[in-house]
């Protein structure tokens, strides 16, 4: 036997999926089935949350704002070229830093030698003063 919803079931379904802007009429038929009438504007009766139809003209207008594949490829090459230039700059700066570190080490060794020489002179002066 097929499922036959009651009038309350039908009303609860209509309340769930439709707005309140309609007139509902329901009668029992001679064969025991329900006859149901809805009177109202279809778009106002049926709720369509999130459902929106777009015409081709509207779609074309929207698509004008999107980037084409060739434009995207051009943009991508420009970005990749700028990344390559930045990478070269970073490599050059890294080499400069290495050179400066080597120079700094050499200066540190020179300063150490100067310090040792000054300490040697200081010891000699102390020896001369003590005599």
Curated annotation (Swiss-Prot):
InterPro entries documented for this protein: DUF16 (IPR002862)
Coiled coil regions in record: none
Family, per entry: Belongs to the UPF0134 family.
Listed name of the protein: UPF0134 protein MPN_010
Organism this protein belongs to: Mycoplasma pneumoniae (strain ATCC 29342 / M129 / Subtype 1) (Mycoplasmoides pneumoniae)
